UniProtKB/Swiss-Prot annotation:
Interacts with Mlc. It is an enzyme of class 3 (hydrolase). This is Mlc titration factor A. It is found in: Cytoplasm. GO terms for cellular component: cytosol. The gene is mtfA. The lineage of its organism: Bacteria, Pseudomonadati, Pseudomonadota, Gammaproteobacteria, Enterobacterales. Zn(2+) binds at H111, H148, H152, E211.
Length: 267
């Protein structure tokens, strides 16, 4: 078990200064000062509630702990840490890991064997991650293992199993399901046309609604322009559910960065 090395009851300004290095990753660059403070507040609560369990020689430094928890906190920054109270442990392998798995083929036959996994979210248990892919989740590439697994846990809050529909108002469920399935079909059509490797989005999103929600949540936070361009209705659903607009946040940050550059004296 990892014991958090920083205090959670510090003044916000002091706490933010200690988290500054942890916040310094491309994924979190668009957040303004107020948003960073909210994110750190949620992350601090999560660190008090979760056990980080390093496996197979993984050594978690305070900076690694902080960055991992900030990734968990991002999707619930406006919802609150309580939305991730469905698990108590995070198991961390050094790299993708081998598990015994059962799966069903297109003919309905069930197969058993070993598969390589990047992460898992158990319905009645922990989240399992690997540090190699956690590090690849720090940028704005559209890939984010931590957000993917956190999305599964949010999905499970709606009845205890993941089906692609997190807790939303009943009046919104039909439109959510329709638009999500339309996105799945669109992604599958693209895969059929150009192949998995040339597809513009992760083919895993077309496998089932639960994976579609998790994969598109990755794009929502780390490649919002792509998601909004491809599936604007899904993007708006996600804005309502997560209570965030990452694309607006990204554009604000880009404009501010351009203004700073244009006002800088020529060197």
């Amino acid at each position: 078990m990892i014991k958090w090395l920083w205090k959670a009851n510090q003044p916000q300004a002091e706490m933010l200064a200690q988290w500054r290095e942890a916040l310094n990753i491309p994924l979190l660059a668009p957040l303004n000062e107020e948003e960073q403070q909210r994110l750190v507040s949620v992350a601090s609560h999560l660190l008090q509630q979760k056990r980080l369990v390093p496996l197979q020689g993984v050594v978690l430094t305070p900076l690694m702990q902080a960055r991992l928890t900030l990734l968990f906190a991002l999707p619930v920054m406006e919802l609150g840490a309580k939305w991730l109270d469905g698990f108590h442990e995070v198991l961390i392998y050094p790299s993708p890991f081998v598990v015994d798995d059962d799966w069903q083929d297109d003919a309905g036959l069930v197969h058993s064997g070993q598969t390589v996994q990047s992460g898992q979210s158990w319905e009645q248990g922990p989240i399992v991650l690997n540090w190699q892919d956690i590090q690849d989740s720090f940028d704005l590439s559209g890939f984010n293992l931590v957000i993917h697994e956190a999305a599964h846990k949010l999905d499970m809050r709606n009845g205890g199993h993941s089906n692609g529909v997190p807790p939303i108002a009943m009046r919104d469920v039909a439109a959510w399901e329709y638009d999500l399935h339309q996105a799945m079909d669109n992604i599958q059509d693209e895969i059929d046309m150009v192949g998995v490797d040339a597809a513009s989005m992760d083919a895993y999103a077309a496998s089932d609604p639960a994976e579609c929600f998790a994969v598109l949540s990755e794009y929502f936070f780390s490649a919002p322009e792509l998601l909004e361009n491809r599936f604007p209705l899904v993007y708006r659903h996600f804005c309502t559910f997560y209570r965030q607009d990452p694309l607006a946040r990204l554009k604000r940050w880009e404009n501010e960065s351009q203004n700073i550059e244009s006002s800088s004296p020529m060197g």
